[in-house]
């Protein structure tokens, strides 16, 4: 595997990923879970489910006391809200069906749109 994204933390998975130097992103919804996962060597913390359950408050929960914490937003991220999540401070976003369903042309077009949104948002954030 190039990286592993999970719905929850697992010390066993973290140890295996560390052994083979595979970036690991466990799903966390509390600061305790996130801190433990980072202590176990997680590359970043997957905030999950973010959009329809916790929303931006989960990003605030993690980033306010620990602004350096690497976060991945996952669950309900789409072309309409991707920029908002990046602006809120997440480092990356997980997307499912947007980049896996449809023809290869549709997937390629969606990937290009995602890339453009990321580039535009990061450029705007650097000049702000």
Regions found by a protein language model. Give the residues of each.
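Generic structural signal for well-ordered alpha-helices
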Residues: 14, 34, 56-59, 82-83, ...
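C-terminal helical cap(s) of enzyme catalytic domains, especially alpha/beta-barrels
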Residues: 18-19, 86, 101-128
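Short, surface-exposed connector motifs at secondary-structure boundaries
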Residues: 15-20, 39-44, 64-67
């Amino acid at each position: 595997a190039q990286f592993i994204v999970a719905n929850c933390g697992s010390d066993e998975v973290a140890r295996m990923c560390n052994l083979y130097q595979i970036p690991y992103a466990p799903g966390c919804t509390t600061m305790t879970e996130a801190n433990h996962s980072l202590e176990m060597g997680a590359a970043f913390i997957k905030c999950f489910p973010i959009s329809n359950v916790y929303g931006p408050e989960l990003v605030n929960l993690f980033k306010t006391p620990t602004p350096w914490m690497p976060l991945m937003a996952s669950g309900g991220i789409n072309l309409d809200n991707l920029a908002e999540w990046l602006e809120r401070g997440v480092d990356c976003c997980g997307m499912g069906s947007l980049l896996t369903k449809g023809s290869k042309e549709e997937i390629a077009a969606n990937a290009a749109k995602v890339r453009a949104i990321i580039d535009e948002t990061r450029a705007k954030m650097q000049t702000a």
